[in-house]
């Protein structure tokens, strides 16, 4: 029996979710995990928290909505607050997870989290692209040749790229 863990971060939905699809393709059991980072409640160098009350309320409503939709499909959302790499690694070990999936992030803090998690995990971490309309591999040019002006980018992309259809919402989520 293969168990996967899907680490949710900025992708609190079930539709058009590439890491979820990859996890479903490779698992008999699935853990959906969201970790609310403690660091978000600390002040930045500018003296304000990374998350304000309005954003936190919206995030919690989004998580509740995700929990409801996961339960309707037989899944369960695990919610924790703390250090995400520590929590994900601990859950992966406790539940004997074979692989962890997540969306690839590009911001420096999130990249550090990914590196930290990789060091802690005893299983592979599979990061999937999918937070943008196009994957890097679908571009008609290399990133080195990325047009500096948006209209040039748009013209090349419109001419040469076929936009993928969204991934449908899974009908069933495996239990954990």
Give the positions of each predicted feature:
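Substrate/cofactor-recognition hotspot
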Residues: 164-176
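Trp/Phe/Arg-rich N-terminal binding region typifying the photolyase-homology
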Residues: 1-165
């Amino acid at each position: 029996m293969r168990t996967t863990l899907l680490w949710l971060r900025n992708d609190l939905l079930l539709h058009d979710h590439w890491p979820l699809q990859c996890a479903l393709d490779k698992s008999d059991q699935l853990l959906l995990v969201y970790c609310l980072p403690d660091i978000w409640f600390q002040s930045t160098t500018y003296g304000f928290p990374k998350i304000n009350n309005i954003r936190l309320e919206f995030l919690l409503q989004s998580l509740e909505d995700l929990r409801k939709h996961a339960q309707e499909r037989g899944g369960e959302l695990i919610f924790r607050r703390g250090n995400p790499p520590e929590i994900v690694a601990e859950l992966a070990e406790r539940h004997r997870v074979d692989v962890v999936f997540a969306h690839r992030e590009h911001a420096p803090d999130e990249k550090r989290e990914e590196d930290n998690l990789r060091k802690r995990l005893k299983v592979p971490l599979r990061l999937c692209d999918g937070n943008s309309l196009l994957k890097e591999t679908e571009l008609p040019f290399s990133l080195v040749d990325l047009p500096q002006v948006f209209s040039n980018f748009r013209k090349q992309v419109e001419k040469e790229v076929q936009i993928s259809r969204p991934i449908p919402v899974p009908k069933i989520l495996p239990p954990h």
